[in-house]
């Protein structure tokens, strides 16, 4: 790990455990080397660091371009493997950025829903992740996060609440899984990934 990434990793882990009683299960399913997609449900700004501390090695993320316009914040997040995406241009920009990262052998975090949930429930999948899988055929690790909505909901305040991250078994795809290079085919694959995430249960 790069020094700043290692520092943020350690700090995030400490805060997650002390403030949010963070727990993780299924970490043996994580692909720690080579290109892979970490696909998770999205409820909160806490989700990226929670996924980050669940994995042993560095991950790469996409972040809104506007965040990089703030000099200090932009400098910080770029040093912890965040890349800017212009959301005003739609999913295409994000898809291209992620494909480039995967082709370089990096492991990236993707939220199939595309944005944070307003009520904590899993939303409808967008076709972007399906397109990325079709173009790269990299393995996908489904991850479900529990409790981050209660800890920091969209538009709400941050507060202590237990969070749990559960990692499912990797999914692998071949060309035959795709009916064609079209939006409908990509959407079906995206829905398969999101269904795998939704099927993950929190251990009692």
Label each region the model flagged.
Residues 17-25, 89, 146-149:
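Short gly/ser/thr-rich secondary-structure transition/capping motifs
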Residues 1-23:
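N-terminal membrane-anchoring alpha-helices
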Residues 10, 17-18, 30-89, 97:
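Catalytic core of membrane glycerolipid acyltransferases/transacylases, capturing the structured
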Residues 28-31, 157-158:
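A short beta-turn/loop motif at secondary-structure boundaries
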Residues 3-4, 93-204:
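Non-catalytic C-terminal accessory region of glycerolipid acyltransferases
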Residues 23-24, 29, 168-171:
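A short N-terminal beta-strand-loop micro-motif at the entrance of redox/enzyme domains
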Residues 22-24, 82, 140, 165:
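Generic structural signal for residues in well-ordered beta-strands
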Residues 21, 35, 162-164:
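A residue-level signal for beta-strand positions that form part of recognition/binding surfaces
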């Amino acid at each position: 790990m790069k020094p700043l990434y290692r520092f943020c990793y350690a700090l995030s882990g400490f805060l997650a455990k002390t403030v949010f009683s963070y727990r993780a299960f299924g970490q043996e399913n994580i692909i720690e080397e080579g290109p892979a997609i970490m696909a998770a449900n999205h409820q909160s700004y806490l989700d990226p660091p929670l996924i980050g501390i669940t994995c042993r090695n560095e991950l790469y993320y996409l972040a809104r371009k506007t965040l990089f316009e703030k000099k200090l914040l932009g400098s910080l997040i770029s040093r912890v493997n965040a890349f800017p995406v212009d959301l005003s241009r739609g999913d295409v920009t994000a898809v291209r950025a992620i494909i480039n990262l995967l082709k370089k052998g990096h492991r990236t975090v993707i939220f199939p829903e595309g944005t944070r949930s307003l009520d904590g429930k899993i939303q409808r999948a967008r076709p972007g992740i399906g397109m990325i899988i079709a173009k790269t055929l990299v393995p996908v690790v489904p991850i479900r996060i529990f409790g981050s909505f209660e800890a920091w909901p969209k538009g709400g305040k941050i507060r202590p609440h237990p969070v749990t991250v559960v990692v499912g078994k990797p999914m692998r795809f071949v060309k035959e899984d795709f009916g064609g290079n079209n939006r409908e085919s990509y959407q079906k694959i995206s829905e398969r990934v999101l269904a795998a995430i939704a099927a993950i249960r929190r251990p009692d």
